[in-house]
Amino acid sequence: MNIVFLDRDTLSPQTRLRTPGFAHTLTSHGRTALHEVAARIADADIVLVNKVRLDATALAAAPRLRCIAVAATGTDTIDLAACRARGITVSNIRHYAVHTVPEHTFALIFALRRSICAYRDAVQAGRWQAAQQFCFFD
């Protein structure tokens, strides 16, 4: 089984990939330009991808391809209709960041409501230190 990762550098170096429980070869490319895709996946059974676009033309160059694993939540870079027509399974990381995205959203709401960025800028500019009283009112 031939596995090709087209853009390994889009993941953190600390991210460890699980070793499949079957005989395989893994070829990892740091990045892949669009003109390199067809040649790199020509003999692939499985393609791992994050940001590289896989369109019908690229997929046609990979007759053995049976699975595309997207290392992200979105599949907008994959021609899903072409995959369906060729019997290629596409999987992605579902439920990724289901807690962190809403937490970050609320953190941004609070930061906006309390003018955190404006106060940070004022402190960095020395305005708090120059205030006549201990509290800094703006």
Task: List PLM regions with ranges.
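Short gly/ser/thr-rich secondary-structure transition/capping motifs
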Residues: 26-32, 49-51, 124-135
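Phosphate-binding beta-alpha-beta segment of Rossmann-like dinucleotide-binding domains, i.e.
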Residues: 94-138
